[in-house]
């Protein structure tokens, strides 16, 4: 079964996809489906993207034969789910990859965003990586994913609504104002075009955001120099995590950009990246439990300024 079901209690869509139950879980290198010679990639490759074998959304989803019954609504789960394999090296990750390889990865993200946005049914393109079994990564081989949604996910609607409200009241993008107001205490790493910081409003311990200093709303607006610097910042932030905690530090990396084939919100929506780590120190997990899940009221046990200091003072080689 694969379909969308509407929740009238929260005004959001839920994706029902039984196919995701079949995904492999933490296979060894010899059984890895995305190593060279594996099930998905039998030929040599550098980096590659392909449609997920176990998708939540499909370009040609099965039809939904359903008549609306009271509050119960269903729709076809039309969309795209892609896997992005960063490298053929099973034993590396963003912190250890050559900078040139990450630059090529950024170009691939841009290309896939451009191509997927051409589909009329695509409303939102979400690029992400789950690193580590602590956040549910099913494959240890370095990879991420891209979901092209046929609707605006709820948190995206909330972000757009909040940024719109701020812009209407202040006549300024909220992230642009954050960039103008930030000092040194929450800074993690800075370049000419980007600032990586633990935000004043961090929800997770050691949460890091990456903000372009220039107001851009999607990856498609990045200049050549910005794309190169973006690759560098991604490498530095992830390397700082690994070195500070002396381990392959788990995280959820998420790219937030403006919607496509929807209302133009580019004047107030500022592209940004969020790293949400599931750990509150080297050996302890920060559980997203009842309060966070049920109310979206997050309790952060690590003071953002202290987390930023630790990450800022962790020196890494690029």
UniProtKB/Swiss-Prot annotation:
Recorded hits in InterPro entries, A to Z, give:
GalP_UDPtransf1, GalP_UDPtransf1_His-AS, GalP_Utransf_C, GalP_Utransf_N, HIT-like_sf
Q: Which reaction does it catalyse?
A: alpha-D-galactose 1-phosphate + UDP-alpha-D-glucose = alpha-D-glucose 1-phosphate + UDP-alpha-D-galactose
User: Recorded GO terms, molecular function?
Assistant: UDP-glucose:hexose-1-phosphate uridylyltransferase activity; zinc ion binding
* Residues that bind Zn(2+): 32, 35, 90, 141
Kindly tell me the pathway this chain contributes to. Answer: Carbohydrate metabolism; galactose metabolism
Residues bound to UDP-alpha-D-glucose are 130, 145
One GO cellular component term noted in the UniProt record for this chain: cytoplasm
Q: Which cofactor does it need?
A: Zn(2+)
**Cofactor note text:** Binds 1 zinc ion per subunit.
Write out the entry's keywords from A to Z.
Carbohydrate metabolism, Galactose metabolism, Iron, Metal-binding, Nucleotidyltransferase, Transferase, Zinc
Asked if the Swiss-Prot or TrEMBL record annotates the protein with the keyword Zinc, the reply is yes
Task: Give any single GO term for biological process.
Answer: galactose catabolic process via UDP-galactose, Leloir pathway
Q: Which residues does the entry assign to the active site, renumbered to this chain? A: 143 (tele-ump-histidine intermediate)
Does the keyword tRNA-binding belong to this entry? Answer: no
Question: Might you give the EC number(s) for this enzyme?
Answer: 2.7.7.12
* PANTHER family from the UniProt entry: GALACTOSE-1-PHOSPHATE URIDYLYLTRANSFERASE
Family the UniProt entry places it in: Belongs to the galactose-1-phosphate uridylyltransferase type 1 family.
The entry's protein name is: Galactose-1-phosphate uridylyltransferase
Gene behind the chain: galT
């Amino acid at each position: 079964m694969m379909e969308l079901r509407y929740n009238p209690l929260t005004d959001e869509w839920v994706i029902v996809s039984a196919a995701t139950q079949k995904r492999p879980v933490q296979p060894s290198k010899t059984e890895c489906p995305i190593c060279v010679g594996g099930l998905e990639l039998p030929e040599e490759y550098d980096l590659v993207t392909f449609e997920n074998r176990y998708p939540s959304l499909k370009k040609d989803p099965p039809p939904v034969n359903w008549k609306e019954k009271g509050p119960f609504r269903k729709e076809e789960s039309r969309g795209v789910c892609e896997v992005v394999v960063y490298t053929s090296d099973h034993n590396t990750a963003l912190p250890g990859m050559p900078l040139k390889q990450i630059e090529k990865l950024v170009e691939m993200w841009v290309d896939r965003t451009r191509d997927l946005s051409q589909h009329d049914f695509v409303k939102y393109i979400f690029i992400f990586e789950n690193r580590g079994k602590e956040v549910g990564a099913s494959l240890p081989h370095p990879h991420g994913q891209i979901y092209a949604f046929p609707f605006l996910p709820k948190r995206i609607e909330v972000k757009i609504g909040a940024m719109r409200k701020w812009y209407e009241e202040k006549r300024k993008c909220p992230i642009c104002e954050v960039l103008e107001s930030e000092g040194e205490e929450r800074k993690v790493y800075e370049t000419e075009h980007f600032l990586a910081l633990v935000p004043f409003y961090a929800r997770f311990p050691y949460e890091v955001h990456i903000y372009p200093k220039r107001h851009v709303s999607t990856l498609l607006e990045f200049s050549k120099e910005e794309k190169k610097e973006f690759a560098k910042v991604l490498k530095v932030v992830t390397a700082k995590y690994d070195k500070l905690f002396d381990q392959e530090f788990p995280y959820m990396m998420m790219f937030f950009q403006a919607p496509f084939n929807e209302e133009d919100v580019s004047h107030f929506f500022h592209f940004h990246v969020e790293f949400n780590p599931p750990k509150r120190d080297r050996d302890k997990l920060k559980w997203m439990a009842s309060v966070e899940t049920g109310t979206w009221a997050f309790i952060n046990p690590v003071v953002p300024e202290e987390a930023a200091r630790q990450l800022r003072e962790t020196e890494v080689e690029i």
